[in-house]
Amino acid sequence: METTQTSTIASKDSRSAWRKTDTMWMLGLYGTAIGAGVLFLPINAGVGGMIPLIIMAILAFPMTFFAHRGLTRFVLSGKNPGEDITEVVEEHFGIGAGKLITLLYFFAIYPILLVYSVAITNTVESFMSHQLGMTPPPRAILSLILIVGMMTIVRFGEQMIVKAMSILVFPFVGVLMLLALYLIPQWNGAALETLSLDTASATGNGLWMTLWLAIPVMVFSFNHSPIISSFAVAKREEYGDMAEQKCSKILAFAHIMMVLTVMFFVFSCVLSLTPADLAAAKEQNISILSYLANHFNAPVIAWMAPIIAIIAITKSFLGHYLGAREGFNGMVIKSLRGKGKSIEINKLNRITALFMLVTTWIVATLNPSILGMIETLGGPIIAMILFLMPMYAIQKVPAMRKYSGHISNVFVVVMGLIAISAIFYSLFS
């Protein structure tokens, strides 16, 4: 009896200890969330003045952590280990709702994958012609080489995808922090002049309006919902009934890392420029690094910008691929199940990979202008799945009821509604 108790305690201790795989997933979560959008964040978040920026910095961690923890708990609440988000929604909400949410989930994430395929082609093409002084190959060939390169990592499976992302995080964070430190001597007091509660700098809007419209910017800057389901499934297989505690710990560390590194970079950029500079950068629709390179006449920043963007896009593409694959697989499995058929998962993964390769290549070659609009329409769906669905499940699903009664649930719902309303306002204004 004593031996059994000792071995149980020992196994619990070994499961509660931090593992190498936990670090890998922590960096994988960071890698999915912090993409090339971080290069526009200082402009989009800073143009409204210092007060909204400070408030957003305070809200960033709780907003990101509580929402993603809710979605992770939702995936973990499925009856059977190995059930991803597409299976759990069907289990909790029925076959019809399961199919609809799976469809929405796919169409919210898949366009982001298409945007990344266009973005990496544009960035490499620009880097070759401007920085390297080379004539880039035809767009169709260049995009094919780049997408095949990223899809090669996908062929080695989920573990390899997360490993590749975690490796790419190191140079990305390193360069981001070096840039933030490099800008410190350029800090000036101009941004501090916008420390006013009644106006909000260059936007022409009041404080509350600026803050309201800035919330979605923060939500999507730290959003890594496409990888959450794969993360929860992997950790449940590894840790069993301790998965929820372990996932919460990994999420907390990933989010602390995200908020500290990104907000330090944002504040450093904002403090080194004037509000008029930020407004000019927004008007020109260029990344903060491109603007800084011209503003401080620093060619080294001009060189670094595309390199950082390429690393950022690659790791975010891989993270979003996991979510898009899950959605696509879910639609196929549910469709076949309705006809009484099934498909072997490795065969389905190969079909999905081929579909993703061909469609991302076609879109990257054609570079259609409607793509940005489609991606924007996916915004409210992501916000609903991330913020509202898990909170609804806490009220309605017995397996989730143990998480009810916390003030953080109210906070997540309020932030979700603010984000969704602001997205719709921006779309139709």
UniProtKB/Swiss-Prot annotation:
Domain of life where this protein originates: Bacteria
Phenotype reported upon loss of the gene: Disruption of the gene leads to phage C1 adsorption defect. Mutation does not impair vitamin B12 utilization. Inactivation also leads to increased ampicillin resistance. Mutant is resistant to phage C6. Mutation also confers resistance to ColV. Deletion mutant lyses upon glucose depletion in the absence of exogenous serine.
DNA damage keyword on record: no
GO CC terms of this entry: plasma membrane
Regions annotated as coiled coil: none
Catalytic activity: L-serine(in) + H(+)(in) = L-serine(out) + H(+)(out)
Membrane topology (Cytoplasmic): 1-22, 68-99, 162-163, 223-249, 319-347, 391-406
Subcellular location per the Swiss-Prot or TrEMBL entry: Cell inner membrane
Induction / repression: By leucine and by growth in rich medium. Repressed by LeuO. Part of the sdaCB operon.
Membrane topology, record value: Multi-pass membrane protein
MF annotations from Gene Ontology: L-serine transmembrane transporter activity; symporter activity; transmembrane transporter activity
Entry keywords, A to Z: Amino-acid transport, Cell inner membrane, Cell membrane, Membrane, Symport, Transmembrane, Transmembrane helix, Transport
Periplasmic side: 44-46, 121-140, 185-201, 271-297, 369, 428-429
Entry function: Mediates the import of L-serine into the cell. Is energized by proton cotransport. Promotes amino acid homeostasis during adaptation to glucose limitation. May also be involved in ampicillin sensitivity. (Microbial infection) Involved in phage C1 and phage C6 infection. Participates in phage DNA transport pathways in cooperation with different outer membrane receptors, including FhuA and BtuB. Is probably required in the second stage of phage adsorption, the DNA injection process. Participates in the formation or opening of diffusion channels through the outer membrane after phage adsorption.
Family membership noted in the UniProt record: Belongs to the amino acid/polyamine transporter 2 family. SdaC/TdcC subfamily.
NCBIfam families named among the record's database cross-references: stp
Protein name stated in the entry: Serine transporter SdaC
